[in-house]
Every structure is written in C-alpha cells, then in structure tokens.
Amino acid sequence: QGWAKALNKMPFVFALVGIALLSIISIPFFHMELGLPDDSFYEEGTHQRDSYDLLVEAYGEGYHASLVVVAEAEQNGEVLSKLELLQGELMSMDHVDYITNVVPKQSGEMAVIMLNPTTGPNAQETIDLVHEIRSAHIEGVKLHVTGTTAMNIDISEKLTDALPVFAVLIIGLAFIIFMVVFRSLLVPLKAVLGFVLSLGATLGFVTWVIQDGNFYEVFGFATSSPVLNFLPILTIGILFGLAMDYEVFLVSRMREEYAHSGNARKAVMAGIRESGGVVTAAGLIMIAVFAGFMMAPDPMTKIIGLALTFGVIFDAFIVRMMIVPAVMILMGKAAWYMPKWLDKILPNIDIEGESIIKELEKKK
C-alpha cells in the first residue's frame, strides 16, 4: 500500500531513477567478451588449479591452448615437400611458442601440425592467432585449425552472432502475444523494453564483476575470467520466461480493473496492491534458488548463478515493481490504446471475461 502511494505521487521520478540505474549498470555489456572458463579459474589449492599451474610452469601458458593445424593440399597437390616452409610460416606468426609435433599423411596430400601459443586459451592473442592461421596464404596449401581451443573460440563466436537473432525473435513473438492478450500497443512495448533493460543490466553487471574483475572475490570467484560463452543465450531464455510471468501477474490485474472501471490510475494501483506481493514473493524464491548456484565449486555454475540471481533482482524489483507501474501511471489511458483496424485483425483472446461482463450488463 505504501509503495503504491509513493509511486502514485512521483511516477516520473521512479521511472527516471529506475531507467537511469539499469542503463548505467548495462554499460559494461558493450565490451563483453565470451569464452569458456578453464581450470585456471578454480580456487588455489584445488586439484584442478594445482594441475593447471604445474603444467603452465613446465610447458608455458600455451600448453592449455594447443592448436591442431591441418595442412591440406589443393588441386591434387602434395604437402610433404612444403612441410619445412609451413613450419617456418607458422613459427613466424606472433604468439606461436613452439611446434610440438608434425604428422604427415603417407599419401602426401595432408599433414597435421600441432603447436602451442604463448598465451592461454581465452587470451585475445590466441583468438587472433587462430584467425591468422586460417587466413594465411601458402601456395598450393589450405590451412585449417581445430582442437579444443579452436572449437571453443568458434562456438563463442557463433553464439555471439546468434544472440541478436535469438533475442529479437523471442522478444518479437512476446510483443505480438501480449498485444493480442492485452489489446494494447504500449503495454507490450513497455513489457519487452523493460526486459531489454533488465537483460542489459544483468549482462553488464556480470561483465563488470567477472570479466573486469570488480569484487569477484565477494561472490566466491578465484579470479577474473571471460563471460561464459553460452551464458547470454541461457540468461535470455530463463530470465525472459520469469520476466513475462511477473509482467502478466501485474498487468492482467491492471487490465481487469481498467476493463471494469475505465480508470487507468486506479487500475495501476489495484495491480500493485493485489499482485505486487505475488511478484515480490516469486522474485525472492527465485533469488534464493539461483543464489544457491553460487555456492558450487565449479566456476561455470557460479557464473550462471550470479547472472540469474541479479537478473531476477533487476527485473522483479526494479523493472516490474518500479518502472512498469510508474510508466503505466504516466501513460494513463493511452497505455490501453489499440487502433481499431488492428483490433479487428488480431484474434480476440478474452482472458479477463470482458465479453461475459458486457453480456451480463446488457441483460440487467
């Protein structure tokens, strides 16, 4: 009740503060780098970290970033006579430490060259080296790069490329569904833009902590690392479902009240009073669940827990309980505007029973 009154008095202030806060937290997202955490991200004293450090001490950081270069002859040529040239070309590249093995095929049209970079698997120098080898031009020979490190780099890049398409697809579908259900243009637009804000803040916060190395010890991480390559996709999927649930909890009650009274401000107040507690309780439950992930020893599980915990905090408590009602108050009746031509085209899903109420009123 008190929160609803405060929002009703200063909706512009609450909307502005919420949007500004999430926008600022989102800034690190724009330099987010994806990768796959390795054993160097475990805490010191663990078996994984001790083994990693011993191998680095003996063979260098690049031991954990070994690359498998496949030299393939073009147009029925052969590679054997060019092995020395190939090795010289590879060793001349920046950040190549040493070649560990060369295995030519007996027929001569192919050879496998294994090499170690000077840097680790998540270093930008290693990523650049993979691209440099693939783009190298040696007459009559085509170079391919594979191995665990190269595959992780490729997966990270593929996921980065797929992220905008995935996000636009599910956000676009949600906009259409919400438009059909709530018979409005601005309500679904506000819902999906609110999700974009909370998603940006979530990934920005994770980047600031995990990648930029701010307060990572507080959350139980041993060191900074790149952001888990499949985390954005995973976060979008899970957080989007939760965010839209919270949105439906709030807005369906607002829609019901508006359909009955026609008073937009009263509808928002009813939604906050009667559904706000549900959103708060649901958010706290999910925060408790996801925070438990951060107790795990595995760095990847910790990162997932961090992202989802703060994702729910940002969406449930800042977007849904602060920005959404404040913006709804500011929009007034315009929030429920739907062009007549569009209203006729869209299927009518009467989730609030408005048609039944109208029929009953006619009979009276």
Q: What are the residue ranges of the model-derived segments?
A:
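Membrane-embedded transmembrane helical bundles of large multi-pass transporters/channels
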Residues: 1-34, 138, 145-364
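Structured non-transmembrane domains adjacent to transmembrane bundles in polytopic membrane proteins
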Residues: 31-216, 226, 248
